Amino acid sequence: MIRTKNIFLIGPVGAGKSTIGKQLAKQLKLEFIDSDDVIEKKCGVDINWIFDLEGEEGFRKREREVIAEILAEKQNIVLATGGGAILDPETRSLLSSRGKVVYLEATIEQQLERTSKDTKRPLLRVDDKRPVLEQLMAEREPLYRSIADVVVETNGATVKNIVNKISTFLVEETIL
């Protein structure tokens, strides 16, 4: 039986899923995919536009479909998911059954710092992001933990350090 080396990065906005995912994929010589990028490319519009037109529910439906398509078509990938991808039970099930799930944990302070000038996050198009981030964390944290094979704290760590922690875990789990 051929083992697939699928690695799925989950976590809140600003945790570094895309940045870390690109470097992890490079180090492991795997393909990197960002589900948000795939959604935008497939729809021909940005995520903010989808949220404005279809709401979060419409976006989550598209996200679930895109992640299912990616997992049906690709193997040996590093997939960075959107921060809310885990809200959908079907997506959680897909991720946990098709590879190793890495939860990149980030503090509210980190998220604020990393998203302060970001306009591509529809749920953060508000003046005071802190209450929104706190609410999202309260809602999503248990879901992240419920499917995570490993939790990696990103606070104060370099991208290289985080990638090395994930690689070490994957070696220990004999996925590499």
UniProtKB/Swiss-Prot annotation:
<dbReference type="InterPro" id="IPR027417">
    <property type="entry name" value="P-loop_NTPase"/>
</dbReference>
<dbReference type="InterPro" id="IPR031322">
    <property type="entry name" value="Shikimate/glucono_kinase"/>
</dbReference>
<dbReference type="GO" id="GO:0005524">
    <property type="term" value="F:ATP binding"/>
</dbReference>
<comment type="similarity">
    <text>Belongs to the shikimate kinase family.</text>
</comment>
<keyword id="KW-0028">Amino-acid biosynthesis</keyword>
<keyword id="KW-0547">Nucleotide-binding</keyword>
<dbReference type="Pfam" id="PF01202">
    <property type="entry name" value="SKI"/>
</dbReference>
<protein>
    <recommendedName>
        <fullName>Shikimate kinase</fullName>
        <ecNumber>2.7.1.71</ecNumber>
    </recommendedName>
</protein>
<keyword id="KW-0479">Metal-binding</keyword>
<comment type="subunit">
    <text>Monomer.</text>
</comment>
<dbReference type="InterPro" id="IPR003593">
    <property type="entry name" value="AAA+_ATPase"/>
</dbReference>
<keyword id="KW-0418">Kinase</keyword>
<dbReference type="InterPro" id="IPR023000">
    <property type="entry name" value="Shikimate_kinase_CS"/>
</dbReference>
<dbReference type="GO" id="GO:0016887">
    <property type="term" value="F:ATP hydrolysis activity"/>
</dbReference>
<keyword id="KW-0067">ATP-binding</keyword>
<feature type="binding site">
    <location>
        <position position="140"/>
    </location>
    <ligand>
        <name>substrate</name>
    </ligand>
</feature>
<dbReference type="GO" id="GO:0008652">
    <property type="term" value="P:amino acid biosynthetic process"/>
</dbReference>
<keyword id="KW-0057">Aromatic amino acid biosynthesis</keyword>
<dbReference type="GO" id="GO:0000287">
    <property type="term" value="F:magnesium ion binding"/>
</dbReference>
<keyword id="KW-0808">Transferase</keyword>
<comment type="pathway">
    <text>Metabolic intermediate biosynthesis; chorismate biosynthesis; chorismate from D-erythrose 4-phosphate and phosphoenolpyruvate: step 5/7.</text>
</comment>
<dbReference type="GO" id="GO:0009423">
    <property type="term" value="P:chorismate biosynthetic process"/>
</dbReference>
<dbReference type="GO" id="GO:0004765">
    <property type="term" value="F:shikimate kinase activity"/>
</dbReference>
<feature type="binding site">
    <location>
        <position position="83"/>
    </location>
    <ligand>
        <name>substrate</name>
    </ligand>
</feature>
<keyword id="KW-0460">Magnesium</keyword>
<feature type="binding site">
    <location>
        <position position="36"/>
    </location>
    <ligand>
        <name>substrate</name>
    </ligand>
</feature>
<dbReference type="InterPro" id="IPR000623">
    <property type="entry name" value="Shikimate_kinase/TSH1"/>
</dbReference>
<feature type="binding site">
    <location>
        <position position="18"/>
    </location>
    <ligand>
        <name>Mg(2+)</name>
    </ligand>
</feature>
<keyword id="KW-0963">Cytoplasm</keyword>
<dbReference type="GO" id="GO:0005829">
    <property type="term" value="C:cytosol"/>
</dbReference>
<dbReference type="GO" id="GO:0009073">
    <property type="term" value="P:aromatic amino acid family biosynthetic process"/>
</dbReference>
<feature type="binding site">
    <location>
        <position position="121"/>
    </location>
    <ligand>
        <name>ATP</name>
    </ligand>
</feature>
<feature type="binding site">
    <location>
        <begin position="14"/>
        <end position="19"/>
    </location>
    <ligand>
        <name>ATP</name>
    </ligand>
</feature>
<comment type="function">
    <text>Catalyzes the specific phosphorylation of the 3-hydroxyl group of shikimic acid using ATP as a cosubstrate.</text>
</comment>
<feature type="binding site">
    <location>
        <position position="60"/>
    </location>
    <ligand>
        <name>substrate</name>
    </ligand>
</feature>
